[in-house]
């Protein structure tokens, strides 16, 4: 059964559909593609699996072209973004274009940013194929590319027309990528929904075995939370910042270790543990909460410690460039309970050094 969730943003509201075989559902896509010139953006891993299926589904609506990019976070940059613009310009695509992001978070972020920029804005559709992109990056309109000095530093808020989440894609997802997606799933439980966190603790094996009912529930709950948060705070002026739990530490790990060497979800898992340990050191939570967080990440085969090669200086140089920094102060999202988090701007660097060095 297909689930539908609405992201309520007034005239820019859009639906999220979650279910099986949705990539073959031309009826759902028809209103967004009729009389449009379609460019599918995908990568070398996803294209052999799903590109022809999507092309066949969309062929009756209009001209369909594709651009296939290399796979990996290290290619989420201005050079490869330009490949999308070149494909559009070479084919003389105009404002009647629609870009379709067929892939994980990298493809979604780059396609959305290209859509935001091309001729000052054309429509785009998200068809996320990884767990991480299904539960997080495809929803909410954050689009960006990386810079050598920082992750997601060049981008825009730009909402899709629709998000199509076909859970059958997860059957071809490598185990490491699935685990990385679970890091974001767990994050929602920590920062927003204690009951969901407990449900995850009780359903580890069902999720790891790709049980359809468990997957649909987990993805739907994450999308419900994300839609609720984005509807309240689209441009991250308030409550949306809570979705960055673990990301300040995590982005530092990704940047320092080289994009693609640590998957985003792996870095978020280790970063969230560091955030929990920081919260404990400040007296916000006790050791039992840290232990539950560590145990759940560990159950999904995720890292719970930072790279051994990273010391305090390695972290802090990246954390000072974080997008949440205001007035020169590092702002951290820290858990205050299972199911609750808050933003803290008075975290001393001495506290951070103690946590990082003792982790």
UniProtKB/Swiss-Prot annotation:
Cell location: Cytoplasm
The protein's matches in Gene3D superfamilies, at most eight in alphabetical order, are given as: 3.40.50.1970, Dehydroquinate synthase-like - alpha domain
Question: One GO CC term of this entry?
Answer: cytoplasm
Q: What cofactor is needed? A: Co(2+); Zn(2+); NAD(+)
UniProt-listed Enzyme Commission number(s) = 4.2.3.4
Cofactor note from UniProt? Binds 1 divalent metal cation per subunit. Can use either Co(2+) or Zn(2+).
Q: What residue ranges carry the coiled-coil annotation?
A: none
Annotated binding of Zn(2+), by residue: 184, 247, 264
Pathway(s) annotated for this protein in UniProt: Metabolic intermediate biosynthesis; chorismate biosynthesis; chorismate from D-erythrose 4-phosphate and phosphoenolpyruvate: step 2/7
The UniProt similarity line reads: Belongs to the sugar phosphate cyclases superfamily. Dehydroquinate synthase family.
The name on file for this protein is 3-dehydroquinate synthase
Q: Please report the organism this UniProt entry assigns to the protein.
A: Shewanella sp. (strain MR-7)
**What taxonomic classification does the UniProt entry list for its organism?**
Bacteria, Pseudomonadati, Pseudomonadota, Gammaproteobacteria, Alteromonadales
């Amino acid at each position: 059964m297909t689930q539908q969730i609405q992201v309520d943003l007034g005239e820019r509201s859009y639906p999220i559909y979650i279910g099986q075989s949705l990539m073959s559902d031309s009826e759902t896509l028809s209103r967004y593609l009729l009389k449009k010139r379609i460019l599918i953006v995908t990568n070398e891993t996803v294209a052999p699996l799903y590109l022809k299926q999507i092309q066949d589904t969309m062929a009756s609506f209009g001209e369909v072209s594709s651009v296939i990019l290399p796979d990996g976070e290290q290619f989420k940059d201005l050079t490869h973004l330009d490949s999308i613009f070149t494909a559009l310009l070479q084919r003389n695509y105009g404002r009647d274009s629609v870009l379709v992001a067929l892939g994980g978070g990298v493809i979604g972020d780059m396609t959305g940013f290209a859509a935001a920029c091309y001729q000052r804005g054309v429509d785009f559709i998200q068809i996320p194929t990884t767990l991480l992109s299904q539960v997080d990056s495809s929803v909410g309109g954050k689009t960006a590319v990386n810079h050598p000095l920082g992750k997601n530093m060049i981008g825009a808020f730009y909402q899709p027309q629709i998000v199509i989440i076909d859970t059958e894609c997860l059957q071809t997802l490598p185990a490491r990528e699935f685990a990385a997606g679970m890091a974001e799933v767990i994050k929602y439980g920590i920062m927003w929904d204690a009951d969901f966190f407990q449900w995850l603790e009780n359903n580890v094996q069902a999720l790891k075995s790709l049980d359809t009912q468990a997957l649909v529930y987990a993805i739907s709950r994450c999308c419900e939370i994300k839609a609720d948060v984005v509807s309240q705070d689209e441009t991250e002026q308030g409550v949306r910042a809570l979705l960055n739990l673990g990301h300040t530490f995590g982005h530092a790990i990704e940047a320092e270790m080289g994009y693609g060497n640590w998957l985003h979800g792996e870095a978020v898992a280790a970063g969230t543990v560091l955030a929990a340990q920081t919260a404990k050191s400040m007296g916000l939570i006790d050791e039992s909460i840290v232990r539950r967080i560590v145990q759940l990440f560990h159950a999904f085969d995720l890292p719970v410690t930072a790279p051994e090669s990273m010391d305090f200086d390695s972290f802090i140089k990246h954390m000072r460039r974080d997008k949440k920094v205001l007035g020169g102060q590092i702002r951290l999202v820290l858990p205050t309970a299972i199911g609750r988090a808050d933003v803290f701007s008075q975290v001393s660097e001495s506290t951070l050094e103690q946590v990082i060095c003792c982790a």
